Amino acid sequence: MLRRQARERREYLYRKAQELQESQLQQKRDLIKQALAQGKPLPKEVADDTKLQRDYQYDESAQESIDDEYSALSGIVDPKVIVTTSRDPSTRLSQFAKEVKLLFPTSVRLNRGNYIMKNLVDACQKSGTTDLVVLHEHRGVPTALTISHFPHGPTASFSLHNVVLRHDILNAGNQSEVHPHLIFDNFTTPLGQRVVKILKHMFPPGVKKDSPRVITFANRGDFISVRQHVYVKTRDGVELAEVGPRFEMKLYELTLGTLENKDADVEWQLRRFVRTANRKDYL
């Protein structure tokens, strides 16, 4: 069993490395196309690559493929999500975990107990879980959310800001548990689309024509605002009511392995020591 998992992981990492190499080559080809179309000089790293320019005449536009991590079950079966917390959670974090569980229609909340992370991940993989959500806190305030996809990753780590629970919202109303409509706004970069893929695969696929429930993920300056509303059609139009919870997420790390794998390759990481880090939008 362990040998088979190790072999599958090696094969998967090899495919990802090949895919990454091809995507980098395709980005350079796109830069050549843009420079030729706009009459601008080539960037230095492309201008110095004579082999790339020699092969450009044989270039064919690469077609975007479904990410291998989600291709097996994407759009076919409902995701199986487990929501849990760090050890010894406060009352507020436990309440927040219940509300996050209600965000994802097919999720289950698990009391962490004395589970160490490796045993928790092993239990999730044996039970056919597709995603694990772990919530963290500092002095009773939720501060981080981690999403790990099984069986091979990726793992996305977000910091949490301005968390408002449902009972803190005036006239929040009842929580609807029907499958929601999803809105993803202003995710314009390849990294942003990667985050969209991770988030949307937490929800069941399929058409939801009659669902009155809407969950919005709006990117503003790399802070992802999460809002949940229900709407009712009236004679005069549409009435919208927020039901919560309400919070902002900021991506700070994306790794290619699962949560317990400390040696996993880092796909992207926020680096605050770079001078332009605070002036650049990554999503």
From Swiss-Prot:
Protein name according to UniProt: U3 small nucleolar ribonucleoprotein protein IMP4
Cited function: Component of the U3 small nucleolar ribonucleoprotein. Required for the early cleavages at sites A0, A1 and A2 during 18S ribosomal pre-RNA processing.
**Listed InterPro entries:** Brix, IMP4/RPF1
Per its UniProt entry, which superkingdom is the organism in? Eukaryota
Q: Which GO terms describe its cellular component?
A: Mpp10 complex; nucleolus; small-subunit processome
Question: Tell me, what is an example of a GO biological process annotation in this record?
Answer: rRNA processing
Principal location listed in the UniProt entry? nucleus
Subcellular location, record wording: Nucleus, Nucleolus
What's an example of a GO molecular-function annotation for this chain?
A: rRNA primary transcript binding
Q: Which PANTHER family match?
A: U3 SMALL NUCLEOLAR RIBONUCLEOPROTEIN PROTEIN IMP4 (PTHR22734:SF2)
Residue intervals of the Brix domain: 79-260
Q: Gene encoding this chain?
A: IMP4
The record's annotation in PROSITE patterns points to: BRIX (PS50833)
Organism listed in the record: Eremothecium gossypii (strain ATCC 10895 / CBS 109.51 / FGSC 9923 / NRRL Y-1056) (Yeast)
Q: What's in the keyword line of the UniProt record?
A: Nucleus, Ribonucleoprotein, Ribosome biogenesis, rRNA processing
What quaternary structure, including any partners, is listed in this protein's UniProt entry? Component of a heterotrimeric complex containing IMP3, IMP4 and MPP10.
